[in-house]
Amino acid sequence: MSASSPAERRQRAQQLPPLRAEDDQAIQRFLDRLWAEQGVARQTLDSYRRDLEGLARWRDGAGGGLQGADRSALFDYLRWRTEARYAPRSNARLLSTLRGFYALCLRDGVRSDDPTALLDPPRLPRSLPKALTESQIDALLAAPEIGTPLGLRDRAMLELMYAAGLRVSELVTLPAVAINLRQGVLRVTGKGSKERLVPLGEESQHWLERYLETARPTLSERKAVPAVDGQVPLFIDAARRPLSRQQFWGLVKRYAAVAGIDPDTVSPHGLRHSFATHLLNHGADLRALQMLLGHSSLSTTQIYTLVARQHLQTLHARHHPRG
């Protein structure tokens, strides 16, 4: 059974009742604690809010609302989402959000039990990261029309994402001060507010310099760019605002079509996968790759070794006389 489309999910969300004030307050307290105690990124907090609002609206105040939900109610909600064709990975993330929320309720004495304790996460199929070929990457990066300020910005963004292996949330929220062109490095604040230094590479540094020298001043009309969360964004639109993840997603799809690549096979995260896969194919060390990607666990990085192994097997089958 295939996962539901974004349009189908929006339609289902519109059919649910509005959020109750008590549930909204409980959700906001949870998010405020995460931000204050763990420094969770804004995009992650937005995802948690959507997860909790979905459950709260589905329950519509039954049995004490969101904070009063029991194991049976949570099981019914997960079953409803499964029948509504939400992807297993989406349901797994929801359960992770619920575990955090009810752990806080338990800690604060709002309730005396954890209704998620005996809930099993959905089984996730093991899927290998999908990487573009190096020739496809070349075509994709060359797709923007660099004769325009927006096209030059897009070229710089694509080059940087592939050169540094950034997450899309890291790219669109990147502050201008994170770039050090003189030293050729980028300071990235990743998940859990962990910082890492990533080399830029000659190509991405070249396009960043061109963007900063010509395109960005034109887009900002040579006015000061407003700060967001206390920092001035590096990449901006014609209204001097940072791009959203959805905007960049649309740009990647559009340029994939220009490059002659099926847009359905390309995503911003695919550039990060390509970065990792191509480095391994060219002999990069797994520990070094872990540091560049900002993975807290080496096991997360090791999945790329399977992709690299597949690449070697394909080369062997294609070129060895007895392959």
UniProtKB/Swiss-Prot annotation:
<dbReference type="InterPro" id="IPR011010">
    <property type="entry name" value="DNA_brk_join_enz"/>
</dbReference>
<dbReference type="GO" id="GO:0007059">
    <property type="term" value="P:chromosome segregation"/>
</dbReference>
<dbReference type="InterPro" id="IPR013762">
    <property type="entry name" value="Integrase-like_cat_sf"/>
</dbReference>
<dbReference type="InterPro" id="IPR010998">
    <property type="entry name" value="Integrase_recombinase_N"/>
</dbReference>
<keyword id="KW-0238">DNA-binding</keyword>
<dbReference type="InterPro" id="IPR044068">
    <property type="entry name" value="CB"/>
</dbReference>
<protein>
    <recommendedName>
        <fullName>Tyrosine recombinase XerD</fullName>
    </recommendedName>
</protein>
<keyword id="KW-0159">Chromosome partition</keyword>
<feature type="active site">
    <location>
        <position position="167"/>
    </location>
</feature>
<keyword id="KW-0131">Cell cycle</keyword>
<feature type="domain" description="Tyr recombinase">
    <location>
        <begin position="127"/>
        <end position="317"/>
    </location>
</feature>
<dbReference type="GO" id="GO:0048476">
    <property type="term" value="C:Holliday junction resolvase complex"/>
</dbReference>
<dbReference type="InterPro" id="IPR050090">
    <property type="entry name" value="Tyrosine_recombinase_XerCD"/>
</dbReference>
<feature type="active site">
    <location>
        <position position="269"/>
    </location>
</feature>
<dbReference type="InterPro" id="IPR011932">
    <property type="entry name" value="Recomb_XerD"/>
</dbReference>
<keyword id="KW-0132">Cell division</keyword>
<keyword id="KW-0963">Cytoplasm</keyword>
<feature type="active site" description="O-(3'-phospho-DNA)-tyrosine intermediate">
    <location>
        <position position="304"/>
    </location>
</feature>
<comment type="similarity">
    <text>Belongs to the 'phage' integrase family. XerD subfamily.</text>
</comment>
<feature type="domain" description="Core-binding (CB)">
    <location>
        <begin position="21"/>
        <end position="106"/>
    </location>
</feature>
<dbReference type="GO" id="GO:0003677">
    <property type="term" value="F:DNA binding"/>
</dbReference>
<dbReference type="InterPro" id="IPR002104">
    <property type="entry name" value="Integrase_catalytic"/>
</dbReference>
<comment type="function">
    <text>Site-specific tyrosine recombinase, which acts by catalyzing the cutting and rejoining of the recombining DNA molecules. The XerC-XerD complex is essential to convert dimers of the bacterial chromosome into monomers to permit their segregation at cell division. It also contributes to the segregational stability of plasmids.</text>
</comment>
<dbReference type="GO" id="GO:0009037">
    <property type="term" value="F:tyrosine-based site-specific recombinase activity"/>
</dbReference>
<dbReference type="InterPro" id="IPR004107">
    <property type="entry name" value="Integrase_SAM-like_N"/>
</dbReference>
<feature type="active site">
    <location>
        <position position="191"/>
    </location>
</feature>
<dbReference type="GO" id="GO:0071139">
    <property type="term" value="P:resolution of DNA recombination intermediates"/>
</dbReference>
<dbReference type="GO" id="GO:0051301">
    <property type="term" value="P:cell division"/>
</dbReference>
<feature type="active site">
    <location>
        <position position="272"/>
    </location>
</feature>
<keyword id="KW-0229">DNA integration</keyword>
<comment type="subunit">
    <text>Forms a cyclic heterotetrameric complex composed of two molecules of XerC and two molecules of XerD.</text>
</comment>
<dbReference type="GO" id="GO:0006310">
    <property type="term" value="P:DNA recombination"/>
</dbReference>
<dbReference type="Pfam" id="PF02899">
    <property type="entry name" value="Phage_int_SAM_1"/>
</dbReference>
<dbReference type="GO" id="GO:0006313">
    <property type="term" value="P:DNA transposition"/>
</dbReference>
<dbReference type="GO" id="GO:0005737">
    <property type="term" value="C:cytoplasm"/>
</dbReference>
<dbReference type="Pfam" id="PF00589">
    <property type="entry name" value="Phage_integrase"/>
</dbReference>
<keyword id="KW-0233">DNA recombination</keyword>
<feature type="active site">
    <location>
        <position position="295"/>
    </location>
</feature>
<dbReference type="InterPro" id="IPR023009">
    <property type="entry name" value="Tyrosine_recombinase_XerC/XerD"/>
</dbReference>
